[in-house]
Regions:
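Conserved catalytic-site region of short-chain dehydrogenase/reductase
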Residues: 1-15, 36-43
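Mid/C-terminal beta-alpha module of Rossmann-like enzyme folds, strongest
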Residues: 50, 54, 80-120
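Residue-level signal for the nucleotide or nucleotide-sugar donor/cofactor binding architecture
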Residues: 11, 41, 45, 63-69, ...
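NAD(P)-dependent short-chain dehydrogenase/reductase
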Residues: 22-63, 68, 72
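Active-site Tyr-X1-5-Lys
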Residues: 9-29
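Non-catalytic, hydrophobic alpha-helical segments
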Residues: 71-75, 89, 97-100, 123, ...
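Glycine-rich Rossmann NAD(P)(H)-binding loop
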Residues: 36-40, 56-65, 87-95, 109-113, ...
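Amphipathic terminal alpha-helices
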Residues: 133-153
Length: 153
């Protein structure tokens, strides 16, 4: 599933995810992954564009960024649990996109969610705790970003 299912009216992708969650799933656990990041992100994602100087615009949107290593830990926990139904996988913390990078054009993005923030109650009940955070990741990659975009941060 996806965190987009919370606002199915925004776009067809979100509507599809919402409908899939409404189907009966009596013996399944499925994850709503929030914005996953790593040093090798998908090329169409914000973090890739940020690390490679390809940011065309920023929005006022907020995202719950979760590192891929933490996603793996969440999957391992869920594999060994008896939980069923949808589970949010994220940090439970939203970060404003326009606070990450400055000096690029601003754009309103009405077809995107304004804010994503995982409800981590279920994962925390299993002992889940994120070890990575977006701020440290960005600071660790500061020199790369600074070379590509002198206006970042």
């Amino acid at each position: 599933s996806s965190s987009t299912q919370y606002e199915p009216h925004l776009n067809p992708y979100a509507a599809t995810k919402h409908i899939i969650e409404k189907l009966p799933h009596t013996n399944a656990c499925f994850m709503r992954l929030h914005t996953v990041y790593s040093k090798n992100p998908r090329k169409d994602m914000f973090i890739y564009k940020l690390l490679n100087g390809g940011i065309e615009y920023v929005s006022n949107n907020e995202r719950d960024f979760i590192h891929v290593n933490d996603v793996v830990k969440a999957i391992e926990l869920l594999l060994h649990s008896d939980l069923k139904g949808p589970i949010d996988v994220g940090t439970g913390i939203s970060t404003k996109i326009n606070n990450i990078i400055k000096g690029v054009p601003f754009k309103v993005t009405p077809k995107e969610r304004k804010k994503t923030k995982a409800n981590t109650t279920i994962l925390h009940s299993l002992g889940f705790k994120c070890e990575e955070n977006i701020e440290d990741f960005l600071l660790d990659n500061w020199s790369i970003m600074r070379e590509m975009n002198p206006h970042s941060f």
